[in-house]
């Protein structure tokens, strides 16, 4: 067994050292700088819909630019949301507006807190640093597979909300988008449902960060003419195994060494028809949790706490679903297709 490390070092005479080394051994490196945010002005506060990762970062960025945004979220703040999730796990009682999918932090808040992307964006460092500034472990800045953990991520999310408010922004929970107020092609505001009453929020700028599971909101937006297009997605099941089995398989005879953390894995295969099947969101030392957001549905997800000290490991086993599988290029057909598979699976 061996380990692969990439190390960044600071040297007095970098050019001299590089000249002595063989090509490919080392190269100059500079951490990407965080973008400078220009101060912006709007006639009305911009509205961000959804307090998942995209919405939180959008609202935080606007707040840092001096804009004082309004962030609305149909679910509850993470403190109250935790109680709703516990009620579902322990008693099987679902709150359709506050669950593993809906609420502050989005689905990721109760889904392990792995930070992963297939891109090489220079903004990655800024995102990771923001998490650290709000309480995430500093090691996410340099480990290959950064992981916060569900237990720590809740505090990070709460801290990000507090910064938005301190900078003059608003965060409104239990507030669901029900429609856009348009005059021709111009945005004049949005309609929301809050406390059982319909309210209007005047704005000319709306950022939609509604996530994966707000299908009612997606259908409303489509009926109002918001441009949408079908895209590939994946669906599948969760597989679970003893963590000892995975660690022994990956580490061999060294698997019990105290310096080694719970092992993970990633598998992928392309079937003869070209469709991909692969594992995703592997949770070492984690658990499978109930993750439904609809009263008539059954869904599971995987998560780990920061220590990853549980007895079992789990992973999603997914298969790709392509737009040509839907049989129609009408955007809502993709939801109908997905719903049909979900219904058959539940039955």
Residue ranges and their predicted role:
Residues 336-343:
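Conserved small/polar residues in nucleotide/adenosyl-binding loops
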Residues 1-5, 80, 86-170, 175-176, ...:
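Conserved N-terminal/central alpha/beta ligand/cofactor-binding core
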Residues 49, 201-211:
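Short hydrophobic core segments
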Residues 173-186:
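A conserved short coil-to-beta-strand element within the FAD-binding core of flavoproteins
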Residues 67-85:
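Glycine-rich FAD pyrophosphate-binding loop
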Residues 42-51:
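Beta1/beta-strand and adjacent pyrophosphate-binding region of the FAD-binding site
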């Amino acid at each position: 067994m061996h380990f692969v490390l990439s190390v960044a070092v600071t040297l007095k005479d970098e050019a001299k050292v590089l000249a002595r080394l063989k090509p490919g051994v080392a190269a100059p490196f500079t951490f990407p700088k965080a973008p400078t945010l220009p101060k912006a002005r709007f006639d009305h506060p911009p509205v961000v819909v959804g307090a998942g990762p995209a919405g939180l970062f959008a609202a935080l960025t606007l707040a840092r630019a001096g804009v004082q945004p309004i962030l609305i979220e149909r679910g509850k703040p993470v403190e109250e949301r935790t109680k709703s999730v516990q009620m579902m796990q322990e008693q099987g009682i679902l709150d359709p507006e506050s669950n593993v999918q809906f609420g502050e932090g989005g689905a990721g808040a109760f889904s392990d807190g792995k930070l992963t992307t297939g891109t090489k964006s220079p903004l990655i460092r800024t995102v990771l640093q923001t998490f650290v500034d709000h309480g995430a472990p500093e090691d996410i800045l340099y480990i290959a597979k950064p992981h916060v953990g569900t237990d720590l991520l809740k505090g990070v999310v709460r801290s990000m909300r507090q910064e938005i408010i301190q900078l003059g922004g608003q965060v409104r929970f239990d507030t669901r988008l029900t429609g856009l107020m348009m005059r021709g092609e111009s945005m004049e505001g949005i309609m929301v449902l809050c406390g059982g009453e319909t309210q209007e929020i005047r704005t000319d700028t709306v950022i939609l960060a509604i996530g994966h599971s707000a299908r009612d909101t997606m259908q409303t937006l489509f009926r109002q003419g918001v441009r949408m297009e079908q895209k590939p997605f994946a669906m599948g099941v969760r597989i679970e195994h003893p963590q000892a089995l995975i660690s022994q398989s990956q580490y061999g005879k060294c698997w019990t060494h105290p310096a080694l953390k719970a092992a993970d894995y990633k598998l992928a295969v392309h079937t003869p028809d070209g469709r991909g099947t692969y594992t995703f969101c592997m949770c070492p030392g984690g658990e499978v949790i109930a993750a439904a957001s609809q009263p008539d549905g059954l869904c599971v997800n995987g998560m780990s706490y920061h220590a990853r000290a549980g007895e079992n490991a789990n992973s999603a086993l997914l298969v790709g679903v392509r737009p040509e599988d839907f049989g129609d290029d009408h955007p809502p057909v993709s939801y109908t297709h997905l719903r049909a598979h979900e219904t058959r699976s539940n039955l």
